[in-house]
Amino acid sequence: VVHVVFVAPRFLENTNRYVRAFAELDDVTLTVVSADPEAAIPAPLRPRVAGHYQVADPLDGGQLTTAVRAISRGIGPVDRLAGALEQLQLPMAEVRDALGIDGLRVATARNFRDKDRMKAVLRQAGVPVAASALARSPAELRAFVDRVGYPVIVKPPAGLGSRA
């Protein structure tokens, strides 16, 4: 039996689909970490969830580490740590590194969470990528546009759109 801890910041409809998918797997013990209380777990899923640990901020690697450590003591060793949100990948990697859980590590998570770093890694591997620059000011952005021309796409280095 594989013990999976799923990080569900909130028990929203889309997140519940992932919780349900893990809950329906044979030979999986499922525990969830969430900012929501245990009562927020949808009633049909509760019988398949072995445990719940509530944290104030599921995006905080320290809080997740504390939660997973407590889950390991209370329910048993954790084999996998999963979560659907892109923003969870770095804090979950911090937990894996801290507790020796198999899966994506911090260095790798940073490679795909930070767009500038990701492009540098791809370039080093010989993968062609579009010209890019980490512009920290309007002047740096103008200099990049002067060098490469239009069109350009401007994105934050990490995060979703304008919510970096």
Which functions belong to the PLM regions below?
Residues G51-Y53, R110, A130-L134, A164:
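Structural signal for short hydrophobic segments within the conserved structured cores
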Residues N111-A130, S137, F144:
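Glycine-/Pro-rich loop/turn segments that contact NAD(P) or position catalytic residues
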Residues V1-T108, R113, R117, A139:
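ATP-binding N-terminal substructure of ATP-dependent carboxylate-amine bond-forming enzymes
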Residues A131-S132, P151-A164:
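Glycine-rich phosphate-binding loop of ATP-grasp-fold ATP-dependent ligases
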Residues D146-Y150:
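Nucleotide-sugar donor-binding and catalytic loop/hinge architecture
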Residues P44, F144-V145:
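Short glycine-biased active-site loop of nucleotidyltransferases that positions the nucleotide triphosphate
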Residues D102, A125, A158-G161:
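A short, flexible beta-alpha/helix-coil linker loop
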